[in-house]
């Protein structure tokens, strides 16, 4: 009885790990929203609406403000 229980648990663990591989890995993705104005929280609101992420205005090397959206994605 204990061998069959051990085998059953082992099979369940193997199947669970296979399902996790099929579903993909979660990672942090980044997207630049070039058409977004960086005033009055529009960057944060648009990023939240599009990808349920967090948006932040950052300054580029040429001193332009761009909206950078960070969100969780599956790769």
Swiss-Prot record:
Disulfide bonds join 29-73, 38-57, 43-67, 47-69. The keyword Ion transport does not apply. It holds the Pfam family SLR1-BP. GO terms for biological process: defense response to fungus; killing of cells of another organism. Residues 1-24 form the signal peptide. Keywords: Antimicrobial, Disulfide bond, Fungicide, Plant defense, Secreted, Signal. Its main location: secreted. It is found in: Secreted. GO terms for cellular component: extracellular region. The keyword Secreted applies. Belongs to the DEFL family. PANTHER family: DEFENSIN-LIKE PROTEIN 127-RELATED, DEFENSIN-LIKE PROTEIN 184-RELATED. This is Putative defensin-like protein 126.
């Amino acid at each position: 009885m204990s061998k069959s229980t051990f085998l059953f648990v082992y099979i369940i663990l193997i199947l669970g790990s296979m399902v996790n591989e099929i579903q993909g890995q979660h990672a942090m993705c980044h997207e630049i929203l070039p058409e977004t104005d960086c005033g009055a929280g529009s960057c944060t609101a648009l990023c939240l609406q599009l990808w349920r992420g967090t948006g932040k205005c950052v300054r580029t090397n040429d001193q332009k403000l761009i909206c950078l959206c960070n969100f969780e994605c599956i790769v």
